Amino acid sequence: MIAPVLLQRQQLDRLWDIDRSEIIDILYRLQDGKLHPYPDYYDVRGWDPHDRETYTPIHEACFDRGGAFFALFEGEEIVAAAALDTEPRGPRQDLRQLLFFYVSAHQRGQGLGKQLFQLCLRQAAQEGAAGLYVSSIPNKSTVDFYLAQGCRLIEQPDTELFAREPEDIHLVCLCR
């Protein structure tokens, strides 16, 4: 098991070094309260150039309000990271958003994602939150990962997050 590191603000740019490449061939669509898989194809070869421009200020704002950015390194290479925001989310404002969550392509399937997810869940509980709010890309394998961690569809999505990412699958994972 790789020991997690808490990133400092000046290290947030390292998040973009994670190899997010993957082939996506099935997506989920939420209809009538149920997930419906459908075929679609994306060959993701890394970060879209607009991602850094769009999300870096969001990451920095999260950090500045006390958010935690956990990272796993193999030597000098960042191989996985997760960010837990402190801003209240959800219908009762008692959830904390899993703001960023990626495992490098060559490290998937080794338990690193599960390790980081559990770390964020424990951190949310320590901060007094009822659980995690996850706004997931609709990629079937990603959503299935979250479901396997104990997430479930949230009945009432966070208004701001749903407006920002209406195609995402909005989930909640309660602290145990």
Located regions from the model:
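Acetyl-CoA-dependent GNAT
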Residues: R9-Q10, D17-D94, L99, S104, ...
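Short polar/acidic secondary-structure junctions
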Residues: P88-G90, I137, T159
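Conserved acetyl-CoA-binding loop-helix of GNAT-fold acetyltransferases
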Residues: F100-V103, G109-R122, L147-A148
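Short glycine/proline-centered loop/turn elements that form peptide/ligand docking sites
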Residues: G113, F117, N139-T142, T159-E165
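Conserved GNAT acetyl-CoA-binding A-motif
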Residues: A124-I137
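Conserved catalytic-core motifs of GNAT/GCN5-like acyltransferases
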Residues: Y133, L147, R152-I169
